[in-house]
Structures are given as structure tokens and as C-alpha cells.
Amino acid sequence: MCRLVGVVASEVTEFGLVLKEAPRSLARLSREHRDGWGIAAHGHPDTIPPPSERSPHDGVWRVHKGTDPAGECNRFLEIASRSAGTVLIAHVRQKTVGPTSIANTHPFIQSGWAFAHNGTLVDHASLRARTSAERLAQIRGDTDSEVLFAFLLTRLDEAGATRVGSCTNAREQATRAIATATQDLRSQKAGAFNFLLSDGSSCFVHRFGRSLFLLERTPHGPPRMRDGVDPASTGPWTPRRHAVLVASERLTEEPWSELPEGTLLRIDRGPSPKIVWPDAPERVAS
């Protein structure tokens, strides 16, 4: 198993709360999920890498990874303290397929998309057979997760959603492609595959086989933390700020909702992040 955290916010937001301050932050969860960590942040000027570190496939994601347990890694704690943006995908790993290594640490980045997975797939060969040679050639690690990412990117390629200057309905094309792909995998009993997948403007969230919770935090709903953690530790909650959070576990005492098994949703970034439900069996249950 692994643990995921995703945030889509209406304005630049500091992510220290979910990464290290909350009682169920990724730093705390890494006590059991000790095989590496990764943070991918999008949407803040400081998240744009310098030219020497920039890849044409990275978009404007700023990615940091490590192989130590996050809560015991000074580098993670320092990065978590200053990580900010409008979109976050973060992950701590408990390995099931592939050794502990940077190449096997999530999130993975290709063609401007970031991806993190929680679960285990049962038939890699079948998934590879339905993945393009171009995407298979981009795999650098040993995980089933990276194969799943390559498979989903293949479906996005076929829908025209990964091309630079994609048409105005690329978001809907991407949604149809991801919905079809996840429905197929569920029907084939491909295994457990919770995931977060984002291009920085939208974030796809899927639950199948592992726990996943959602919280919509409105401009007038500041966080309420256990153990006396001050919400102001992550910066003031401004009158305009609106965010949607997704996590493998409830991070706070707020009214998180459990996503039903088989749910796919899309969170669109904007002045008021919008949740779109292309594939939600029963919506959410508190």
C-alpha cells in the first residue's frame, strides 16, 4: 500500500499542512509507508525549474523525490515547509512491485502530466500489450504504477489530449478517455488502482481497491486540526481561497467524505475549483 494526497486550489496555497503538519500528514503516515516519497507542485512561479533542470515533458511541475521515510528525511521536511502552488500531487510509498529507488518513486511526470498510484495490478503483460511503444519506452522504473501511467497516457494520446495546443474540448476528450480506460480495467479485475492524474489544470481522481476521501474547503471554511495544530501555520485562509483535497486517509477533523468504490471524478482548477463526476456510482458518503 501507499498513501496519496492531492490538492486543487483557487489560488497559490502552501502545502505544509497536508505534507507535514497534520496528525495524518504524509510525514506521519511515512512511519508505515517507508519506501520513498515524492512531491509534485504546479502553479507557483517558484515551482518552475531553472532552464538547466527543465525537461520539455515536465510542463511547469516542480518535482522532488527521495528514498528515505518522509518523516525522517530532513530534505522532505524542508521542501514540505516551502512547497506551494495551485495543484499538489504527493505520495509516500510502501513497495509491492519494484525495489526502493528514485525511479520507482511517485509521482511520475510525462508530457506535462503528473501521476501517483496506490494499489497493486495483477496483469502487467496485458496492460503493456495495450500500451504504445512510445509510452513503454519512457518507463524508467520497475513498478506496475508506471506501466499504468503509460497505459493511461496512451489513451490520452489517442484522444488527442496530450498534444501541445490541443483543441478547446481536450478536457472533455481526456475525461472520456480516462473514464473508458478505468471502466475497462475495473471490469477486467485488473487489481487495485487508486490514482491521481493531473496536467495542472484538471486533476483526475480514481478509487478502486483502496480507501480514498474528499474534502471541499470553501473560502469561509478554515481547517480544523487535531492536537492543537494552528491552521495559520500554512498561511492565512483568505476570503477568496477555495480548495478541494483528496487523501487516502482523513487528515483533519473536517467533514471528509469517503469516495465510493469505482468512482472517477475530475477537479478543474479555477477561481472556484469545480468537481465533475463522469463516473461516480453513488457520489460520496460521509
Regions found by a protein language model. Give the residues of each.
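A residue-level signal for conserved active-site and pocket-lining positions in enzyme catalytic cores
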Residues: 2, 39, 89, 148, ...
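Long, charge-dense
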Residues: 130-157
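A conserved acidic, glycine/proline-rich C-terminal tail/linker
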Residues: 221-264
